[in-house]
Amino acid sequence: MTTAFYPGSFDPITNGHVDVLVQALNVAEKVIVAIGIHPGKAPLFSFEERAELIRLSLAEALPGKSANITVVAFDNLVVDAARAHGATLLIRGLRDGTDLDYEMQMAGMNRTMAPDIQTIFLPAGTASRPITATLVRQIAAMGGDVSAFVPAAVLQALTSKRKA
């Protein structure tokens, strides 16, 4: 069974992330969504909240296939975490040339550290290219409508956070 590792902060998961996950299931039988835990960062959503939002979003977007996706946390090197979970593929989504430049650099470093793990680049669909979790958080914090950018569960969670 081919296992792919898709790391990110997913704070929150967006339609762009979901698009990449749908594509990832076309190249791997199992995908591990790995939420990076960084002590120096203060995320909007806790790990538990992000994990639940990912599960809810994928159950909606991938009925019957969400069982092929596991959500985990990691706080070490991506390649070490991927290897620990038995992954041989590292999934990276690309929105534009800027993403490609950065991701190519990271892929080179990762390949040097872990030649047994191959990086797969998956291009974002046209509708999800402009979406970033940072922009979603900023727009939502100012009361803007982010319904076109996030799954329904995330929209509800963002609305609840704003009212709190």
UniProtKB/Swiss-Prot annotation:
Q: What class of enzyme is it?
A: transferase
GO annotation, cellular component aspect:
cytoplasm
Function field: Reversibly transfers an adenylyl group from ATP to 4'-phosphopantetheine, yielding dephospho-CoA (dPCoA) and pyrophosphate.
One of the GO BP terms on file: coenzyme A biosynthetic process
Q: What is its main location?
A: cytoplasm
Instruction: Name the lineage.
Output: Bacteria, Pseudomonadati, Pseudomonadota, Alphaproteobacteria, Hyphomicrobiales
| EC number of the protein | 2.7.7.3
Residues that, per the record, bind ATP: 9-10, 17, 93-95, 103, 128-134
Subunit text: Homohexamer.
InterPro entries from the UniProt entry: Cyt_trans-like, PPAT, Rossmann-like_a/b/a_fold
Q: Which family does it belong to?
A: Belongs to the bacterial CoaD family.
- Keywords of the record: ATP-binding, Coenzyme A biosynthesis, Cytoplasm, Magnesium, Nucleotide-binding, Nucleotidyltransferase, Transferase
Q: Where does substrate bind?
A: 9, 41, 78, 92
Q: What are the subcellular locations of this protein?
A: Cytoplasm
The record's section on PANTHER family has: PHOSPHOPANTETHEINE ADENYLYLTRANSFERASE
Q: What is this protein called?
A: Phosphopantetheine adenylyltransferase
